[in-house]
Amino acid sequence: MTAAALAPARPEGFFEALAPQGRRVLFALAAIAVCMLFAFPVLWLVLTSLRPGTGVYYVHRGTEFTIDNFGEVLAQEIVVRALLNSFLISTLATALSLGVTATSGYMLSRFRGPLPNAWFSLIYIFRCVPYVAWVLPLYFVTQRLGIFDTYWGLLLPHVAVHVCFFSWIMKGFFDGIDPSMEYAAMIDGCSRWGAFLRVALPAAVPGLTALAILCWLYTWNEFLFALILTAQNTPILAVVMAQFVHELGMEWHLMSATAVLALGPALIVTIFGQKYVIRGLKV
């Protein structure tokens, strides 16, 4: 008899012992459990936004639902202003960030020399700095420049954060584009800038679309910069929700209604932009 025949059989693991159908059922149950884990807070938020104020605290009134909370929230001018400001700042920050990030990523991908190396090192250093450590210096800078509690006071920090992070991703997108197409365009008379605009940039559209969605969602959900760099002139929705916490308690029903209003645009962008994000990140 051979040594292989005399060797003891290797015990099967738990997943190997299961039949293929049993493994599929097990994975399906695990997926359902994970989905429920993430969906439960959202469901609770929506249900709380539809309950009257007393229904949040008393179980016997928990089955009463109303949409009056949304009317009460939208009747407050500061909430409407915050909703519009959040949308405007998210859109403008995304547009500015894409313009700077595209050129930054292209430079890091195509050029070598002191300037690209210095820019790469600067981005790397800023990415090593903890996010919270930026807040206090930015507060003093915006105060000195006179842009505290203005659109620019929020836009510039967001653009700086996006450029430092997404330049790395854009570099990867441009690294995946064959530079010979740009060289062919330059032989036909295009300048380097023309080759970038007419050849490299259109080829990077899937990546730019993915970054645009990520930038918009990040800015829409951002809280810390909005809390420190704004006051009354530029209310942001993430900060306005905190006004329902006061010395008399927490107005959970109104806070939840405002949170659902904030969740709506982000959910729409995520649902319709999911395939673009996946496609862009696969480039």
Where are these regions (language model features)?
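A hydrophobic, multi-pass inner-membrane permease signature
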Residues: 2-283
